[in-house]
Regions:
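Short, solvent-exposed secondary-structure boundary/capping segments
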Residues: 89, 138-156
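Acidic-enriched and Gly/Ser
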Residues: 74-89
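Glycine- and charge-enriched low-complexity intrinsically disordered segments
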Residues: 152-191
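Short alpha-helix capping/helix-loop boundary micro-motifs
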Residues: 88-113
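Active-site-proximal polar cores
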Residues: 1-74, 191
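Short coil-to-beta transition motif at edge beta-strands of beta-rich domains
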Residues: 110-125
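Short beta-strand and beta-hairpin "edge-sheet" elements
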Residues: 122-145
Length: 191
């Protein structure tokens, strides 16, 4: 039996931790734009997305965990040859997500899973003027500190443009694909 005189995770302590995290993200983070993926056409048999679009961008503060450069940078041998991925990890506040972005995304009919950031959505980072695709969302880290989770950790890779329609209304993002870059690389292959 647990000691009844020591209460783990009172609402006041949880709110204090969440406020401290929000304050740190505002001080040490950067403003990024979260872009939810909208599904236009989908194959009903294998549930493959045939066509998708990004029609809105929501600013939110995020902390970049690996300022030293891209993460592990594993070199993969794919069917098209050797491929090197460029990965970044962003940390965003769960409370800011639930209060600011979730109500806006929930009202969109062609967006799925509005309760948290989801894999396949995009993050626009103005520091490098690049788009990153969310590959994995860690929503239980740190693991229930004071019996609550406070942040989402987004593991992202440099976005490779295929057939997506990107028209967010934010000129910095929309011009990103009209200039020299389509997948984060110039036409000559330099990053």
């Amino acid at each position: 039996m647990l000691n009844p005189f020591f209460i783990q995770g009172t609402a006041g302590e949880q709110n204090l931790i969440q406020d401290l995290i929000n304050e740190q993200l505002r001080m040490y983070g950067v403003e990024v734009h979260y872009m939810p993926r909208s599904f236009i056409h989908e194959n009903s048999v294998i549930r493959e997305v045939i066509e998708s679009s990004f029609e809105s961008a929501y600013p939110i503060e995020a902390y970049i965990q690996n300022y030293e450069g891209y993460a592990d940078n594993p070199v993969l041998l794919s069917k098209f040859g050797i491929e090197q991925t460029q990965e970044l990890t962003f940390v965003i506040s769960k409370e800011r997500w639930e209060n600011y972005i979730e109500p806006l995304v929930r009202d969109k009919p062609d967006v799925r899973l509005s309760s948290r950031p989801k894999e396949g959505d995009l993050i626009y980072l103005p520091l490098g003027d690049r788009l990153y695709e969310i590959k994995y969302v860690e929503h239980e880290k740190p693991f229930y500190q004071l019996q609550k989770n406070y942040v989402y950790e987004l593991r992202c890779e440099l976005f490779r443009y295929e057939d997506e329609v990107i028209d967010t209304g934010v000129m910095e993002i929309d011009d990103n694909l009209l200039g020299n870059e389509t997948d984060g690389y110039d036409y000559d292959g330099n990053s």
